[in-house]
């Protein structure tokens, strides 16, 4: 970890759950369950939570719901964890408004995804991220996920954005460990693994931590993995990484939203079903997920 990475770890955390958004039976936002889930995840070892990200079904929630959710989670965890707000959309002006609203509510940082659907050029990406970073004083993470946004943030664009004082890191979900390692060395930006299957490799490359989906179900194990790696016990870190691999396999079948909501229900935490176009797991999928969770020792 670089000096900047250590600072970002203190400001934003090292084990962050990309938290689901709980919904009631009628599909409305369930802030009471969100508060309970947030406390549960912190109790299990998370020192950060991301709300209204991909796994939080951000495309299906209104700005008002995003702020209600942020407020509920901030009130629930207090000073026990950092709360990062997803503020990225495919519209720069909208992203700026949302970032300002999240900052006013007390978010500790922002996660801003690459604008999706419109496929902007790299020059447009640089201008977009710069404009959002200019809008508040909060530390901001770039969210690089071309599998969903169609366009990657190219290494030279990330290097250029690294000069902005509010842009402090990257959530990488494109599996480019080689470029990530070079960018960390060149810029001091903190990197977070955005792909649970690559958590340990990212640590080996110098990443600060994880923004994790499987932490919904295995936060304790991931905290142990981070602790083992940090103390130089690589054998234990590898053992834990292998142990949670069935959850990554399940996520590849179900997707992060369906996996997390079904898995939490199996663990006794009902966060409701996804909003369309995401869907709840079928009975057959739940049976297969339960087997994977037992294999990962997160379900009895």
Curated annotation (Swiss-Prot):
Its EC number is 4.3.3.7. It is found in: Cytoplasm. Pathway: Amino-acid biosynthesis; L-lysine biosynthesis via DAP pathway; (S)-tetrahydrodipicolinate from L-aspartate: step 3/4. The keyword tRNA processing does not apply. Changing residue 204 to R: Exists as dimer in solution. Has similar activity to the wild-type enzyme. Slight decrease in affinity for substrates. SMART domains: DHDPS. Is insensitive to feedback inhibition by (S)-lysine. The active site is at 143 (proton donor/acceptor), 171 (schiff-base intermediate with substrate). Belongs to the DapA family. HAMAP family: DapA (MF_00418). Was identified as a high-confidence drug target. This is 4-hydroxy-tetrahydrodipicolinate synthase. The lineage of its organism: Bacteria, Bacillati, Actinomycetota, Actinomycetes, Mycobacteriales.
